[in-house]
Amino acid sequence: MLLRTKRRALPRPSWPLLCVGLFAFNPLADASETSALTLGTVTVQGDSVASGPLSTSSVLSSVDILGGDILEKMPVNYSWELFNRAPGVLLTPFNQGTTSGKISFRGFNGEGEVNAVKLLIDGIPSNSNDGNMPFMDMIFPLELDSIEVVRGTSDARYGLNNIAGNVNMFTRTGGDYTKARLRYGSYNTQETQLAKGIEGSNWTQNYFFAYQKTDGFRDHAQADKFSLSGKWFYTPDDDRYRLGLIARHYETEAQEPGYLSEQDAHHHPSMTNPYNASDKGTRRMNQLSVHLDTELSETLAWSAKTYLNTFDDRRWTQYWRTSPQQERDAYETQYGALTSLTWRPDVSWLYDFALEGGSDFQQQRNTSERYRTRDRARLAQTRDQQFDFDTYGAYLQAEIKPFESLKIIPAYRVDKIRGSFTNEMTGLDYAINDYGLIKQPKLSVVYSPWSVASLYANWGRTFQVGTGAAAYKIPPRDSDLAPSINDGWETGIKFTPTAWMDGRIAYWQQEASGEVSRRLNDPSGESDNVGETRRWGYDAQLNLHPNDRTEMWLTYAWQYSKILKPSATLPNSKGREIDHVPHHLYNAGVSYQATPALQLSAWMNGQTHYYLERENTQGTYGGYVLMNLGATYRVSESVSVDLQLKNLTNRYYEYAWYDPDGARAALHSPGDGRAVYSGVTLDF
C-alpha cells in the first residue's frame, strides 16, 4: 500500500548540554524519537515502522531526506547538482564531459583521490571500483521519490566506500500517474523526461525515459545522453511478500573543453584550448536487480537484494599543451547481494526492541587500460590491468528503547577483502593485501526529554582500503598493508520550538589512521600514503514555514582538516590542510506561493576558497556565492510552466587544481555563466 505523506522539516538532533535549557519551556511541537530531517514529500511503503528492515531514519543519527517534490523541477544537467539542497554537502564541478562532477561531505573532497561516500540506487551499491559515483548520472530528477543522505560513521549496514557516510537515491515505486517534463534553455539545452506508473491489485509497474542534449557554456562542451528504466513488483493478496525486478540503461557521449590557465579562465571563461579539440568521453552503464521483502512471522521480516552492474567508460583527455593526450578505458562488471533479517519481539521490560542481522557481498571483475594518444589515435599502451576485487561483510545491530524518550542503537560490522591482480603488459600476477578481518563497532543514542527537542550522539568506525592496483602487493611493496581506520563521533540537537520552525545544530569529528590517496595521473594506478588525518566541523540548519504560503531554509557547515602525521614522502604536509576542502559551505532560500497558481522562489549557495595541494603553498581558489530565481505557474490541474534563472549576477566561479607535471601551476575549469531555463510539466 502506498501512502503519500507531506513531512515538514523534521530536523536533526542533539547538541551540547548547554542548549538544553533553551527548549525546556516549550511544549508546542510533537515529540520526535528520531534524529532525521525530512524536506518535501516522501512515499512510504506500507508500515515502515512496524515491519521490514529497520529504517534509516529510525536507526541512524545523522540523516537528511530530500523529497521528490523539491527535486523534480530543479534546473540541473546532472543529478549530483541536486545535492545543492542537502546540508553540508560539497559539490565539485569538474565540467569535463562525462567527468562532470561529484559530491562529498564531512571534510572529504571530491577530487577522486579519496572517495568517501557510498552510493546506492534503490538500495543497490553503485560505486565504481575507485569509489567514484558515475552510476548517479543514470537518475534524472523526475524519476526520484527521495534522496537519503547519511553522514558520519555510525551506519553498520554498509562497509566498502562508507568512509564518511552514504547516499541512497530512491526512485518511484507504484502509483498511477503519467508525468512528462520538457525543458529548454541556455546553451541550447534540450531535455525530455517521461515517467509512467501503473498500479493494480497485485502488480506495480514503473517506466522512465529521459533524453538530454546541450552545447554547454564553454566551447567544445557538447553533451548527449539518455536513460531508461523499468520496475516491476508483485505483491500477493495476503501481502506476505513483495518481489520485484528493476532494470536500468544509460548512455552518454560528451566533449571535454579542458582546463585553462588562470589568465585565460578569467578573461575568456567560455574558451577551449586547441589541443583539447579531440578530447571527449563515452560511457555506457547497466543495472539489473531483484528485490524480495517478506514477513516470515508477526515478529520476523526478511529482505534480500541481488544485482548486476556493468560500467563501460572511455575517455580521451589532455591536461596541458606539453602533456600527451591519454586514452583511459575502464570496464567493470559487479555482481552481489545484500540480505537482512529483522526480529521485533515483545520484551516486557523494554518499551520497544528490535534486532537486525545482515550480510552482503560484491564481486568485481575489472579491466583498466591506458594509452598515450594523439587526436585519439593510439601511440603506445601505458596500462593494461585486470583485477578481481571481492568484499564480504556482515553486521548486527539492535534498536533498544528502555523507555519512550530514549533510543540506543549498538552495532557491530566486519568486512573481508579478497582478490587477485594481473599486469597484462608483463604477464605477472599479484595477490591482494591481506587486510584481515576489518572490525567496526558503532553506537548511537537519541534522547528526547522534551516534546520540542532531541539530543543525539554517535560514535563509529569505518575503513578505507586501496583501489585499483593499490589494493595489491605489487613490488617494491611485498608486505601486507593494514586498512586505514576511521573513527568518528558526533553530538547535536534537533529542535522544533514552534510548529513553524525546526532545525539542527551539531559538532562532529573524524580521524583516519593511515589515509591513502589515489595517484590520478599515474599509469601504475598506485596510491600515496597521506598519513594520519583529522577532520572536524559544525553543521547548522534552520527551516521556517510561518504560513501555508511561505517556506524558508538556511544551512551552514563549517569544516576543517589537518594532516597530523604525514607520510615520509611529503613531510612538509605536517599540520597542513587537506586540499580542496573549503572551510564554509552554505545555502539558503525562500519559496512563496504568491497566488494559488503562482509560486516564486529564490535561493543561493556558496563556499569559501580551498588549497590546491597538501603542502598549501600554491594559493587558494574556488570560493563563490551564486544567486538563483525561479517561478512556477500552474495553468491547469495537469499543466504547469516554470522559468529558472541560474547565476543571476553572472558571477565568475570555477573549479581549480594544481598540475605538478605539465603546467606546474593551477589549472582552471570555469563554471556556467548566467543561464535561463524554461520548462513545461504535464501531470495526468
Residue ranges: model-predicted function:
Residues 40-74, 100-102:
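N-terminal periplasmic "start-of-domain" segments of outer-membrane beta-barrel proteins
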